């Protein structure tokens, strides 16, 4: 049996997240169906690095699975893509060591969040960015406050309470948090790029929601510092909508 690592991209618009759910269509369901078609009669179960939420996208999701050596590794992407819907694609497949686990062995992840900042919404971005109409957005404050997230902190106030696992350690480390403004062909995109060792449930979307409220003056410039110091959610903004979020990349040793 080979342990095979997949890199997966998907448009999450039509899915209730990555992880299997009863009575809901998920990315994992489609992936398992394709795997079990390709490797029939074997039952194949993929193990993913990240469980993205409903409506969230990925360019660099990673999963691993164990399968018999019946398909050459270079043919696996085409074999799976032939059996996947056109909003899910296998980008790469490689054989890894038998001890590799996509979730456990990840050392850092990059998420990107896209905001379309204009009075109107470009129809081509409606499923891939948050539409932000308010014009009084201070870009300097956005980056200044984003810098306060960098480092190792207890991010408890920046995770969704409902649906989260309280046993997960809330101490995470953010390595980089960069914001590109006036991006895109028309200059209306704001791209939040955050890299960390791991993230709590809906954490990235809450970080972005907080920064937007700092940028428009609804929260003070030191709100991030106060939230991290006190754990008080009074200094935290709303959860940004899911369609702007992309799991960009995952690193391994």
Curated annotation (Swiss-Prot):
GO biological process: tRNA pseudouridine synthesis
List of residues binding substrate: 111
The keyword tRNA processing belongs to this UniProt entry's keyword annotation: yes
EC number: 5.4.99.12
Catalytic activity: uridine(38/39/40) in tRNA = pseudouridine(38/39/40) in tRNA
Keywords of this entry: Isomerase, tRNA processing
Active site: 53
Alphabetized GO MF terms: RNA binding; tRNA pseudouridine(38-40) synthase activity
Superkingdom of source: Bacteria
EC category: isomerase
InterPro entries linked: PsdUridine_synth_cat_dom_sf, PsdUridine_synth_TruA, PsdUridine_synth_TruA_a/b_dom, PsdUridine_synth_TruA_C, TruA/RsuA/RluB/E/F_N
Keyword Metal-binding: no
Entry-linked Gene3D superfamilies: Pseudouridine synthase I, catalytic domain, C-terminal subdomain, Pseudouridine synthase I, catalytic domain, N-terminal subdomain
Quaternary state and interactors: Homodimer.
Family assignment from sequence similarity: Belongs to the tRNA pseudouridine synthase TruA family.
Function, as annotated: Formation of pseudouridine at positions 38, 39 and 40 in the anticodon stem and loop of transfer RNAs.
Name of the molecule in the record: tRNA pseudouridine synthase A
